[in-house]
């Protein structure tokens, strides 16, 4: 007789787990749970959420009025939409004639929900996406069948660089109507910024190709510069907020270090906002009203700058520690991360079985260290590219999102692991 775990309801397909969910599930088989003592989670996709020196105090209480027990509008509370628009104008658009308004903003209950709404609102277009990129894009790009996902390869030997000229060639040559990217890129840490990003926006404008830019790590910028609170957003290079085909996704998850609030936003021309709100009406119904109201207090220019400055100091130190100690073991980085809080390294030079992403993950897991094998970022919607080995089977994503003490302990265990297999 089949057990419950063996049962299969034929109406449902097997849904693959994203990279972080997969590694977390495997760790749970060995006793891991969030907050469990002794575990070091370098696979996590969230930053540490406690107090940081110089940052605004953490929000610890949320007051819920009686009217906040009701549904929020699908497109979000008007006052929060106004706060987001005002913050973007203050951070990126001072002195520019075209300014964002509340009508250019839609609020969602999480980053994946924001992206899901946008994907559901796309028409019958070719949608370009890069390899490697964020693992959750894989199912997102497959579940809706109106658009066709078109992969664009980035080369490790070039540090995953991609020029505006190459972008235009892809748009024109492949007939792309839209492009989905994470910037900074998760997992490589590559940042398209400054004049380069301005040219990308210009190419999109001139070719009427929508740029869908996941900017959830845009306050974690590690390029050299004098700004104590560096941020990067394509909002800075939009000429006309109603005409330029630029759609931005961000929220409190990473840049404010409030992942549990599930407050995110989409910033775009009004016609796009109307479309994603319509999609939200049948996909998710809208986000949490009390949390949106509470978010208004932290979605300000001053709060963003102070939080980013604190992140830059604390996470910058963790980044330097992680990169230097992993590099000393033989982990090779195609490029040092310019943004985000991940190191994307090749373990090919390590002793077997640590010389593949999955082998490294399995061995480190026995030492209660969680990482994410690189093959999960080889986004392959519908598994259409067949059974050939992933180009990133030798890569691992290491997070420096956790507290410094957790990172130090994890690195000590990895160092001991390499010494053991290198005997």
Residue ranges of model-derived segments:
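PLP-dependent enzyme catalytic core of the Aspartate aminotransferase-like
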Residues: 86, 90, 94, 169, ...
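Hydrophobic beta-strand scaffold residues
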Residues: 148-149, 211, 333, 371
């Amino acid at each position: 007789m089949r057990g419950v775990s063996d049962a299969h309801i034929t109406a449902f397909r097997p849904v693959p787990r994203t990279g972080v969910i997969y590694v977390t599930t495997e760790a749970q088989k060995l006793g891991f749970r969030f907050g469990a003592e002794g575990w070091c989670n370098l696979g996590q996709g969230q930053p540490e959420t406690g107090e940081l020196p110089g940052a605004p105090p953490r929000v610890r209480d949320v007051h819920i009025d009686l009217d906040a027990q009701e549904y929020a509008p699908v497109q979000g509370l008007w006052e929060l939409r106004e706060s987001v628009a005002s913050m973007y104008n203050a951070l990126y658009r001072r002195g520019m004639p075209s300014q964002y308004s509340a009508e250019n903003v839609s609020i969602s209950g999480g980053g994946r929900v924001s992206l899901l709404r946008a994907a559901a609102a796309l028409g019958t277009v070719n949608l370009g996406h890069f390899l490697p990129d964020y693992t959750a894009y894989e199912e997102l790009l497959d579940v809706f069948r109106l658009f066709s996902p078109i992969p664009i390869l980035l080369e490790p030997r070039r540090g995953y660089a991609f020029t505006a000229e190459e972008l235009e060639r892809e748009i024109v040559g492949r007939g792309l109507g839209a492009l989905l990217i994470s910037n900074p890129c998760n997992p490589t840490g590559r940042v398209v910024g400054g004049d380069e990003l301005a040219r990308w926006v210009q190419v999109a404008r001139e070719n009427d190709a929508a740029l869908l830019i996941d900017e959830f790590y845009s306050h974690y910028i590690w390029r050299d510069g004098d700004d104590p609170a560096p941020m990067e957003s394509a909002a800075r290079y939009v000429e006309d907020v109603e005409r330029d085909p630029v759609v931005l996704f961000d929220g409190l998850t990473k840049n404010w270090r409030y992942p549990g609030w599930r407050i995110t936003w989409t910033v775009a021309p009004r016609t796009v906002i109307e479309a994603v709100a319509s999609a939200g009406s049948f996909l998710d119904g809208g986000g949490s009203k009390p949390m949106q109201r509470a978010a208004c207090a932290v979605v300000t220019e001053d709060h963003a700058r102070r939080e980013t400055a604190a992140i830059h100091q604390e996470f910058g130190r963790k980044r330097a520690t992680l990169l230097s100690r992993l590099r000393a073991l033989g982990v090779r980085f195609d490029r040092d991360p310019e943004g985000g809080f991940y190191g994307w390294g090749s373990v090919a030079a390590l002793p077997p079985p640590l010389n593949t992403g999955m082998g490294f993950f399995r061995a480190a897991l026995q030492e209660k260290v969680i990482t994410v094998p690189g093959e999960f970022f080889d986004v392959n919607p519908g598994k259409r590219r067949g059974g050939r080995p992933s180009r990133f089977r030798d890569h691992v994503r290491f997070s420096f999102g956790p507290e410094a003490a957790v990172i130090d302990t994890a690195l000590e265990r990895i160092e001991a692991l390499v010494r053991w297999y290198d005997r």
